[in-house]
Amino acid sequence: MHLPSLSLSLTALAIASPSAAYPHFGSSQPVLHSSSDTTQSRADAIKAAFSHAWDGYLQYAFPHDELHPVSNGYGDSRNGWGASAVDALSTAVIMRNATIVNQILDHVGKIDYSKTNTTVSLFETTIRYLGGMLSGYDLLKGPVSDLVQNSSKIDVLLTQSKNLADVLKFAFDTPSGVPYNNLNITSGGNDGAKTNGLAVTGTLALEWTRLSDLTGDTTYADLSQKAESYLLNPQPKSAEPFPGLVGSNINISNGQFTDAQVSWNGGDDSYYEYLIKMYVYDPKRFGLYKDRWVAAAQSTMQHLASHPSSRPDLTFLASYNNGTLGLSSQHLTCFDGGSFLLGGTVLNRTDFINFGLDLVSGCHDTYNSTLTGIGPESFSWDTSDIPSSQQSLYEKAGFYITSGAYILRPEVIESFYYAWRVTGQETYRDWIWSAFSAVNDYCRTSSGFSGLTDVNAANGGSRYDNQESFLFAEVMKYSYMAFAEDAAWQVQPGSGNQFVFNTEAHPVRVSST
C-alpha cells in the first residue's frame, strides 16, 4: 500500500510520444507475446526486465532513491538512502542474482539512517527500508543462504534494521502511543499533526514485531502493537459503523477515532491487509487481529460490495460515510482480492475465497478494458457523474476513469498472484503475463520504466519521469514468482505459509518457523 497522492509535479512529466521516443521492443528487448512461450521463458523475461531497470538505476541514479527514466536523472523522494536499492533486495534474492544482491548489501552497510535533509515518513520508511532489510535477512539466513558467501554482509541487514528503528522510534512518544508519521529525525520533531491515518498507524506491526523477534528486544513490537491497540478496539463506538470496519483518522493525543468514514482505499487499505497477515505471522499471538479481519471481511461482503448497473456481473468495493455509499475505487484498492484470498485459504473459508476471486475479476476488468491493457489510478461507477466522453466505456466495462495515470503500481498483479497460488488456475497466470507485458510495452524506456499519464490513450499518453522503488519490490516480484518454481517464500494454499509478505511485497519468515 502507498498513500494515494501521485506526488508528481508537472516538471516531472516528460511530454514525449512513446512510439517515437521509445519504440516498443527494439532489438535489445525480449519479445513477450509469443504463443510458444514457456513458463521458464516468461520467468526469464521478467528477470531480464528487472535487470534492465536495475542497470539503468545503477548507471544513472544509484545511490539515490529513484531513477528518472526519461531524462536519466535521479530523485530522492525517500530521504536519499537508496530506496530503490533496498526495495530491490528481496526480489534480487528470490531471482538469485548474486551480483545485484552483493551490490545492494555493500550499499546497505554504508547507509547512515540518522542523517537526511528531508521529512521522514514513518510509514514509507517502515515498509520500504525496514521491510526490505528484514526480508533480505530472513531470506539470506534461511532458504537462500547459499547465495552470499560473506555472512557478515547479511548480519549488517539486521544491525541496520535496528539502527533505523532506533532513529524512528521517537515517533511513538505521544500521550497515546499513536505515532506521528512525518518526522524530523535531526531535531526529533514532527509536523504537528493532530491525527494519523488508519493505514499509516496500522501498517507497522509486522515489521516492528519481526525486528523484536529477531533481536530479542521487545521494544519495537510493544510500540507498534500499542498503536495498533486503538484500532483493534475503536473508540468511540460510532467509529465502527459495521463490525470490523472503522474510520480513517485517529487522534494522536488520545487514540480516539475522529470520523467513521470506511473504505479499503488508499489511506485505509493496509490496516485490513495486516490484520490477517499478523495472524499468518503468528496465530498464537495475533488471534484478535484475525477476528477483527474476519469481522471486517464479513461486513465488507454485506455492506460494501457493489455492482455497476451496466455490468452487474462485476464486483467492486464502495466506500461508506454516514449512510452514503461512495461508488468509486482506486488501483490501490485492488489488493483487496488478494487479502480475501489469503484469509480464505488460511481460514478454510470458501466464501472469502469466492468473494476474493470476484474482486480479482473486477480489477482485471479495469485492465482488460483500456487501450493499453493497464488499469487506471482511480475509477468510478457512479451513474450520476459519468462524463459524456466515457458513457460508452461505462456501458461496456462497468466503470469510467477518474484518473488515467499509472505510476507502476502493483496491486492488480499482486491479487492475480494470490489467485494463482490459491486456486492453481492457469487463467490467473495468463492475466499476470498480459499485465506485465503491457507494462513492458508501454512503460519501458532506454534506462528503466516510467509512469503513464493516460492508460486509455493509444500510446499511454505522456510519460511521468519517475520510476518508483516499488517497481523493483512488487511489480517485478509478483510477476516473477508466478512463473518461478515453488519455494518457501511462495504463498501456500491452506495454513502452511513459511513467509508472509509485507505491504511492499517483502517476505518475512513467520514466527513459528
Swiss-Prot record:
Signal peptide: 1-21
A GO cellular component annotation in the UniProt record: cytoplasmic vesicle lumen
Superkingdom to which the source organism belongs: Eukaryota
Alphabetic keyword roster: Carbohydrate metabolism, Cytoplasmic vesicle, Disulfide bond, Glycoprotein, Glycosidase, Hydrolase, Metal-binding, Signal
Glycosylation sites: 97, 117, 150, 184, 251, 322, 348, 368
Reaction catalyzed: N(4)-(alpha-D-Man-(1->2)-alpha-D-Man-(1->2)-alpha-D-Man-(1->3)-[alpha-D-Man-(1->2)-alpha-D-Man-(1->3)-[alpha-D-Man-(1->2)-alpha-D-Man-(1->6)]-alpha-D-Man-(1->6)]-beta-D-Man-(1->4)-beta-D-GlcNAc-(1->4)-beta-D-GlcNAc)-L-asparaginyl-[protein] (N-glucan mannose isomer 9A1,2,3B1,2,3) + 4 H2O = N(4)-(alpha-D-Man-(1->3)-[alpha-D-Man-(1->3)-[alpha-D-Man-(1->6)]-alpha-D-Man-(1->6)]-beta-D-Man-(1->4)-beta-D-GlcNAc-(1->4)-beta-D-GlcNAc)-L-asparaginyl-[protein] (N-glucan mannose isomer 5A1,2) + 4 beta-D-mannose; N(4)-(alpha-D-Man-(1->2)-alpha-D-Man-(1->2)-alpha-D-Man-(1->3)-[alpha-D-Man-(1->3)-[alpha-D-Man-(1->2)-alpha-D-Man-(1->6)]-alpha-D-Man-(1->6)]-beta-D-Man-(1->4)-beta-D-GlcNAc-(1->4)-beta-D-GlcNAc)-L-asparaginyl-[protein] (N-glucan mannose isomer 8A1,2,3B1,3) + 3 H2O = N(4)-(alpha-D-Man-(1->3)-[alpha-D-Man-(1->3)-[alpha-D-Man-(1->6)]-alpha-D-Man-(1->6)]-beta-D-Man-(1->4)-beta-D-GlcNAc-(1->4)-beta-D-GlcNAc)-L-asparaginyl-[protein] (N-glucan mannose isomer 5A1,2) + 3 beta-D-mannose
Annotated active site: 377 (proton donor)
Disulphide-bonded residues: 334-363
EC number: 3.2.1.113
Cofactor annotation comment: Ca(2+). Can also use Mg(2+), but with lower efficiency.
InterPro entries: 6hp_glycosidase-like_sf, Glyco_hydro_47, Glycosyl_Hydrolase_47, Seven-hairpin_glycosidases
Subcellular location: Cytoplasmic vesicle lumen
Pathway: Protein modification; protein glycosylation
Family stated for the protein in its record: Belongs to the glycosyl hydrolase 47 family.
Name this protein carries in UniProt: Mannosyl-oligosaccharide alpha-1,2-mannosidase 1B
Species the sequence originates in: Aspergillus phoenicis (Aspergillus saitoi)
This protein's encoding gene: mns1B
